[in-house]
Amino acid sequence: MNSFTAIDLSQLPAPQVVEQIDYEQILAERKAYAISLWPAEEQAEIAGRLDMESEPLTKLLEENAYREMVWRQRVNEASVANMLALAKGTDLENLAANYNVKRLTIQKANPSAVPPIPKLMESDDSLRERAQMAWEGLSTAGPRNSYIFHARSADGQVADATAESPFPAEAVVTVQSALGDGYAPPALLAIVKAYLSDDDRRPVGDRLTVQSAEIINYQVKAKIFLLTAGPESELILKAAETSLLKFAHQRRRLGLEVSESVVHAYLHVEGVRKVVLEGWVDIVATKYQAPYCTLIDLALGVE
């Protein structure tokens, strides 16, 4: 795995600026304040009228409370749009620009191809992490994390990178591709090497080698035993497969470990009693290797 240890943004506490919005509470507060505007001797009558849904004043306060709820939600959304941990889409792109980092293109669109090739852009998670690493790029590519940051910024097809120095004045950068199984083709390696070899990035004394990650293919074959048998069995099986696919298709990493306990955790969705993996061997990838799931084969277990 690479040596850069970013703050786990998902573990940050919920920001206080984001408030929980309750329409009924807003409406009750609106009614209470409206009642207080009448003379004390008339407030009981007004309160009784506001308890009636057909009362025009009630409708007016309901509309007003709804508008306030919408406004508060807009304030919430504007607040999180300015937080690196929570921003998405173009809001995140504008935040990343503060670090001189932009979203990269993984694959250019080609509508004339058969079938048409869609445009693929860097994911929010990848862009967010590169923004966190931006300070590493202030140095030339001598330090390990600086090499990693610049390698990941060289091209949108770079999903992950590691950097090691097996001998003095020698740097080996390993690249994992965002396309296919993660193997980096020679063309991508040439782009990364040219980018890293820029006089403003690579120290003069470094001998640079850029290589592709070694891909470790693995399959998941499992028997899924359910709490109860019934018509929902296929739905539970599909939910387990979807859950495991979420893990298998997460942002690609070099040195990722795929352990039996992790697979069990993702397959144990609601309704699953027991999981039995067939022929499983834990995968512990080195910093030069990347696991890639080629098959998920789930079947209902019978006892």
Locate each region found by the language model.
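Carbohydrate-recognition loop of C-type lectin domains
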Residues: 136-256
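N-terminal polar alpha-helical/low-complexity "assembly arms" that mediate subunit docking
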Residues: 1-140, 235-303
